[in-house]
Amino acid sequence: MTKRNIVDLPEDLVMEILARVPTVTLVRLQSTSKRWNVLIEDKRFAEQHFTNAPRHSLLIMLMTFRVYLVSVDLHTIHNNKVNIISQLRLKDPLSNFLEEVDICNVFHCDGFLLCTTVDNRLVVSNPCSRDTKWIQPRNFYKKFDIFALGKSSCNKYKIMRMDQFYPDRPEFMNYEIYDFNSNSWRVVGKITDWFIPRCMDRGMSVNGNTYWLASTNKDLTSSSFLLGFDFSTERFVRVSLPGDHLSDPVFALAVTREDPKICVAIIQELHIDVWIATTIESTGAASWSKFLSVELANLYERICLDSWMNFLVDQKNKVLVYRDGNYWISNVFLHVVGEDKCIQVDHHDSVSRCSLVVNYVPTLVHI
């Protein structure tokens, strides 16, 4: 029987094979064949690949205003280092020299990244397909705007922006929606009875919707609640939190890495309890399951956890992954913490600091 090279196979069969190859591997293969490159750039193939390819979670890290795609070993205790796979290079369209823009925040949904720049601009990018779309404002963006990237039940992607119009009254805000189909903004409503503290303004995206910790007053411990935004109805809903809250704990939000679910860490003086939302109804009713409890006294290093901490939950390995919060120069970038483990993950560059870590599932789908 004659052996056949994959490039000689019928196109339908090649599509079927490549649609099951992990995204990052497929991107590396693009340069090996012009035929494959054309195929991988095709929107029909991207949709087929999104449905069939295995989902391998990586991390997005924001370091010194640059966005990196990285992988992390959750098991190695000694000499564990961040493995940088690639860098997202966003060229400034307003610069004659195509300088890179400085990124100050990143939001993630379905492999797309919504980035805010230091000079208050907004851009959506897919690091794998290399698509980039600059989002023009209805009027202008402001430093303390709150953004979220999501999608409706019919898979229409949208951006939600909260605009604080009284600087000294954070509970008074307009909110508006950018629709990718119409490429335009429209004002949807006003907010007057709650606010999202600036230290918690980066929401968590799960199944197309976004969640924050919000408050009805400035006493964040006694009045915090979970707030969700439904991109289908374009409305906010309060979601019930787990626990009895009798001791005024500090809350922090996270997302599971594998099958995305919203998580809440309840931070007490001596321990941390992590809960996973198994279901969230449109009414805000939620069912929670306790995932992990970590006794801080059992760890060899005291860990500083706050309501503005940025962390992820890995269900398979039963650990938390969070960025180092120290303000002094250090090689330590991440901590991996479980019931019986505490691992430090280093980076070779001790000058850089990680200001954000986001779970990322690569996709070839175009913006």
UniProtKB/Swiss-Prot annotation:
One matching Pfam family: FBA_1
Residue ranges of every copy of the F-box domain listed in the record: 3-53
| Protein name in the entry | Putative F-box protein At4g10190
What taxonomic classification does the UniProt entry list for its organism?
A: Eukaryota, Viridiplantae, Streptophyta, Embryophyta, Tracheophyta
Organism for this UniProt entry: Arabidopsis thaliana (Mouse-ear cress)
Q: Which PANTHER family match?
A: BNACNNG10540D PROTEIN
Among InterPro entries, the record links this protein to: F-box-assoc_dom_typ1, F-box-assoc_interact_dom, F-box-like_dom_sf, F-box_dom, SCF_F-box_component
Q: According to the lineage, what is the superkingdom?
A: Eukaryota
SUPFAM superfamilies per UniProt? F-box domain (SSF81383)
